[in-house]
Amino acid sequence: MKRFAVVTLFPDAIDCWLQASVVGRARGRAFDVLYVNPRDFAKDRYRSVDDYMFGGGPGMLMRYDVLKPALDHAKILVQNPLVLALSAGGKVLNQEMCTILSSYEGDIVLLCGHYEGMDDRIFDHVDLEVSVGDYVLSGGELGAAVIMETVIRLLPGFVEKSDNVRKESFTNNLLEEPQFTRPREYEGKEVPEVLLSGHHQRIELWKKEQRIKRTLVQRPDLLTSAKLEPMDLQILRRVLTDMEKVKRAIFGEQSN
């Protein structure tokens, strides 16, 4: 069972997510979460965890003399920990990283900053800085929740039908195909006939073509590292040819 030790000022923010999320059902079976609050390691009667920056600057930084003992304690609670810090300058989280983290044999420590950030000295004790995207959050708790969910979903014991995970978007660096449920028709919008045909080979071919087409249109950057089989490449060429024909029909032969 993989354990996550989260260093955070706001453990309730993550615990509320766990209680509401589907991954919470696997707690105690596929994973567990422990919390370490840096405020418990504050040295003054006010339990201060932040202070003004040396050299000036807006906002407050979390103190190194509070973060370091909190991180040390978190590492004691788990086995062979990999320490990740949520950081805007970190390596951007993707499905490949999630797969690597899920297969890591030890446990994971997540260090969440708050306020204007953390005293930079704490990063000397971190194995990897991770960002969940190019935007600003007020703290690392949401990012930690994202990392945990993406990793937990890949752990043995989380999804009974592991095929569900393997077929999700990004698993092979391709987006999922369009998906439909009842009713078959509503307000003139119909489910593609092929999905109702009962012809499993045609259905699988349609799904594969739609995955490639959707990825090409919405996230072409993923195709550079996608694991494409010879048939996938044939489909990709056909889709590109069809798109070029449409482009010429709309813009003319000289379109670029």
Swiss-Prot record:
> Assembly state and interactors?
Homodimer.
What does the similarity note say?
Answer: Belongs to the RNA methyltransferase TrmD family.
Task: Write down the chemical reaction(s) this protein catalyses.
Answer: guanosine(37) in tRNA + S-adenosyl-L-methionine = N(1)-methylguanosine(37) in tRNA + S-adenosyl-L-homocysteine + H(+)
Instruction: Please identify the protein, giving its name as recorded.
Output: tRNA (guanine-N(1)-)-methyltransferase
Q: Does the keyword tRNA processing apply?
A: yes
The lineage's top-level taxon is Bacteria
Q: Give the disulfide map.
A: none
List keywords of the entry alphabetically.
Cytoplasm, Methyltransferase, S-adenosyl-L-methionine, Transferase, tRNA processing
- GO BP of this protein: tRNA N1-guanine methylation
Its Gene Ontology cellular component terms are: cytosol
The species this protein belongs to is: Coprothermobacter proteolyticus (strain ATCC 35245 / DSM 5265 / OCM 4 / BT)
Describe its function: Specifically methylates guanosine-37 in various tRNAs.
Give the classification, highest ranks: Bacteria, Pseudomonadati, Coprothermobacterota, Coprothermobacteria, Coprothermobacterales
**Where does this protein hold S-adenosyl-L-methionine?**
113, 132-137
Where would you find this protein in the cell? Cytoplasm
EC number annotated for this UniProt entry: 2.1.1.228
